[in-house]
């Protein structure tokens, strides 16, 4: 999973353009006193004929509200250096520039905490963090200052940054592995949409007791929550459980156990 997340395939999520060229970013004061806005120019090379609104909505995941804001923003949409309307056409080879503004209030509800943060990949839109076992991703009952999200806010506080931090998916407390975080509202919306569309895959490594006579296999057993369990635990439940599918592959066989790669 780490190799997948850190590969070039995820850096710009294959946006339907040749590449999302390195965006320029700078901070400036917003129109309201005391508020700071981050302005970024995002540049895309167009691969196929389409129109601007379709590209923004389908390829980049912009909402109606975000597209409407671009219409009235000075130089919000430029094609080959000239300002364009959202209804205009795009031709193969065009260079599309989008001026994005986001209020820099950050995830103010998160309390910054000390901790060692292992960053596997980071750019202006997202980051991939190696989560250790024994720590929650988000604050929840009884854990409001000792989660991975709290440690990340401490990490950014030291750098003088206040990102809008959103995790795309999560891992259970006792599970270690790579966790994907969005750093802006725009990237959070885009990544969440791609997750719903099934464009991300998770792979787990598990140590299982016993000898496996086959190199791969499938497990199809309904699972349900153990009543009253806290934290939540799951168990096989053929009557009330939800359908669950696990695909496993033998990575290495040991004398009394085996290392398996799991795809859920």
Label every model-predicted segment.
Residues 25-264:
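RNA pseudouridine synthases
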Residues 18-19, 32:
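Charged/polar low-complexity intrinsically disordered segments
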């Amino acid at each position: 999973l780490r190799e997948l997340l850190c590969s070039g395939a995820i850096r710009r999520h294959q946006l339907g353009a040749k590449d999302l060229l390195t965006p320029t970013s700078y901070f400036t004061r917003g129109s309201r006193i005391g508020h700071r806005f981050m302005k970024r120019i995002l540049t895309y090379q167009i691969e196929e004929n389409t129109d601007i609104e379709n590209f923004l909505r389908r390829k980049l995941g912009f909402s109606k509200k975000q597209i409407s804001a671009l219409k009235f923003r000075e130089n919000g949409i430029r094609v080959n250096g000239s300002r364009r309307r959202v209804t205009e056409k795009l031709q193969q080879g065009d260079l599309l520039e989008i001026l994005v503004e986001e209020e820099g209030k950050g995830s103010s509800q998160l309390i910054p905490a000390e901790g060692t943060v292992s960053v596997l990949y980071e750019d202006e839109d997202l980051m991939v963090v190696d989560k250790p076992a024994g720590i929650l991703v988000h604050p929840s009952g009884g854990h409001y200052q000792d989660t991975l999200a709290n440690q990340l806010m401490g990490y950014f506080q030291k750098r003088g940054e206040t990102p809008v931090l959103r995790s795309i998916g999560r891992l259970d407390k006792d599970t270690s592995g790579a966790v994907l975080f969005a750093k802006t509202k725009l990237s959070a919306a885009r990544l969440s949409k791609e997750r719903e569309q099934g464009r991300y895959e998770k792979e787990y490594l598990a140590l299982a007791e016993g000898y496996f006579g086959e190199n791969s296999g499938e497990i199809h057993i309904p699972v349900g929550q153990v009543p009253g369990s806290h934290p939540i635990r799951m168990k096989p439940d053929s009557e009330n459980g939800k359908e669950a599918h696990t695909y496993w592959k033998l990575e290495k066989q040991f004398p009394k156990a085996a290392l398996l790669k799991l795809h859920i």
